[in-house]
Amino acid sequence: MILGTPKADWLAEFPRLADLIALRPSEWFNPAIAPSAEALADVGLGAADVADASARLQRFAPLIARLFPETAASGGIIESDLVEVAAFHDALRQHYAAELPGRLWLKRDSHLPISGSIKARGGIYEVLAHAERLALEHGLIGLDDDYSRLAEADCRAFFARHRIAVGSTGNLGLSIGIIGAALGFQASVHMSADARQWKKDKLRAHGVTVVEYASDYSVAVEQGRREAAGDPYTHFVDDENSRDLFLGYAVAAERLRGQLDAAGIRVDSEHPLFVHLPCGVGGGPGGVAFGLKLAFGDAVHCLFAEPTHSPCMFLGVYTGRHEQVSVQDFGIDNRTAADGLAVGRPSGFVGRAMQRLLDGYYTVDDDELFRLLALLERSQGIRLEPSALAGAPGIARVTREPQGYRERMGLTSARLANATHLVWATGGGMVPETEMRAYLKRGRSLLD
């Protein structure tokens, strides 16, 4: 029984569950998608909230440049490159034995400064927003001051009386731990069993308290939430429900618009943009997709990609039960080499907010992630962690889908030929060399 209903009844009502339960790579194109002008109201946030977040990051830029010299060249703005990957596109055509029309680009959040993953967006933003609230409330700064003042000894001593806590499979904890420690906060990261050892080691080297669990992500989050609940000096970064995290990710879209303009890429109904986003609990891809819908409206098509062993958002939105169901309820083990995506229960906030804005969801098995990892390195010389490759099959999934999605969305052959597909590479820039060599070895052995 699942939520009081026999499993057989679930399968009868939701036939795509059979593929999810069997761990077969599958896709579902959302029949409930609505015009963005209508569906954006579901989110409960708007363009003004994203603009406010962007302005906050600008205020903090002098401090970021001071604390992290690697950001000085960008003036303390944490942003990643956008690169066309034509050789990888050709390799995918051969790999999938398909034409795959359009152009293929890679958004390299994998190489964002400070923490080397997409979590450097939302995670760092939320800690900065919390620090700003505290600093303004206690008169350490004014809104028009130079925020680099927050690196001074008296401010650090003030922040040291406060703690930041978070539950994480790895990358969010890395981002929050590093920025929290840099500002002077005490920081606790509750790490699930999936977290890589090198990420724990790196956090400890920054003076962060790492609490390890033998169980999965949801337990780590719950324990972190519980620790923070009784302490007014602890701020818990709630990856399942946080508006601040969501907005930190959403800021990426306006910046991407500028990068696309600079590259001469048009985005409109005749030149659609497909963005393929790896999804764990949902905050990162949800926030980015929200920002993209604000920026490009119905000309952008956002799809979430998950491991076959951890399809929590696909499951939650497809059944309409969101965080009420976990993959484990259906006998799916939530064990994947894509550690950043090893989440069994999705964010209900993101699932409900975005359920009419996302074009679809698809799953990828671990072996395919490793093949794609090796293929990208072989064709382009770019190295990513397995999670970051989840969006790479997306161009093939869209091109070959049999569900009537392209016809329903008016995606004619001419429009697909003019399309830009963007794979959002979520992490991998800080993976130790020995670990990366092992990833590549596994991927090459599967390819050859």
UniProtKB/Swiss-Prot annotation:
SS bonds (residue pairs): none
An example molecular function term from Gene Ontology annotations: pyridoxal phosphate binding
Signal peptide bounds: none
Annotated Pfam families: PALP
InterPro entries registered for this protein in UniProt: D_Ser_am_lyase, Ser/Thr_Dehydratase, Ser/Thr_deHydtase_PyrdxlP-BS, TrpB-like_PALP, TrpB-like_PALP_sf
EC number(s) reported in the record: 4.3.1.18
Record's keyword terms, sorted: Lyase, Pyridoxal phosphate
Modified residues (N6-(pyridoxal phosphate)lysine): 119
GO BP annotations, alphabetical order: D-serine catabolic process; isoleucine biosynthetic process
Reaction(s) catalysed by this chain's protein: D-serine = pyruvate + NH4(+)
Domain of life the protein comes from: Bacteria
Gene3D superfamilies the UniProt entry points to: 3.40.50.1100
Cofactor(s) for this UniProt protein: pyridoxal 5'-phosphate
Family to which this protein belongs: Belongs to the serine/threonine dehydratase family. DsdA subfamily.
Protein name, entry field: Probable D-serine dehydratase
Organism: Pseudomonas aeruginosa (strain UCBPP-PA14)
Gene: dsdA
